[in-house]
Design a protein with these regions (language model features):
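Extracytoplasmic/surface-exposed domains of secreted proteins
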Residues: 1-2
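Extended, charged catalytic domains and RNA/DNA-binding interfaces, predominantly
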Residues: 10-180
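Extracytoplasmic/periplasmic beta-strand context in beta-sandwich domains
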Residues: 5-7
């Protein structure tokens, strides 16, 4: 017996949009990249078909000796200050992103950080945080238990940058994460 089967589908209005951009970039002003933060946002805003840029400079740039405590996550005064001492470098970078967001309704500028562990198996981009977590912070830097320290903050978003094991699983900071 032979039967002919016809398969079809209909896609209605999705209500969703596709956006293009970069979620992992560095500057020379705050990390080991090139140019200033303003240069990066200006370039991305002028580039064709770029909807957003999230700059994620290395976390160790913001570290100070006093930032290795749990309270430093909320108390930005412990973070590295700008040259004129008026705000922390973290606050300055976040304000620069806000400035570029106010300039356009067609482009999103955001600032996060790349959690950078010395000698660790991976780095992670971290977004939507009030402050930064020091790689020297034993209380928040719990890498062996599924980011137990950073999970205390419900609104943050983390993605693994570097490190895959032989099974293709992300190995970020010693934590294996299955891709779903």
């Amino acid at each position: 017996k032979k039967a002919e089967k016809i398969w079809s589908f209909f896609v209605g209005e999705s209500g969703l949009s596709l956006y293009f951009g970069q979620m992992h970039s560095h500057t020379a002003e705050y990390s080991d990249g090139a140019g200033t933060l303003e240069d990066a946002y200006e370039h991305a805003m002028q580039a064709k078909d770029v909807d957003f840029l999230i700059v994620t400079d290395h976390s160790n740039y913001f570290d100070t000796k006093s930032s290795a405590t749990k309270t430093s996550y909320y108390d930005l005064s412990s973070l590295e200050k700008t040259a004129d001492g008026t705000m922390t470098k973290w606050e300055e970078a976040k304000k620069t992103a806000e400035k570029y967001n106010a300039m356009s309704t067609d482009f999103i500028a955001a600032y996060g950080y790349e959690m950078t562990w010395s000698g660790g198996p991976g780095h992670t981009n971290t977004f939507n945080t009030y402050g930064t977590v020091s790689r020297n912070n034993g209380e928040l830097n719990e890498k062996s238990n599924s980011y137990a320290g950073m999970h205390l903050y419900n609104d943050l978003m983390v993605n693994a940058n570097k490190g895959l094991d032989v099974n293709g699983e992300a190995v970020a900071a010693g934590v294996k994460t299955k891709w779903l």
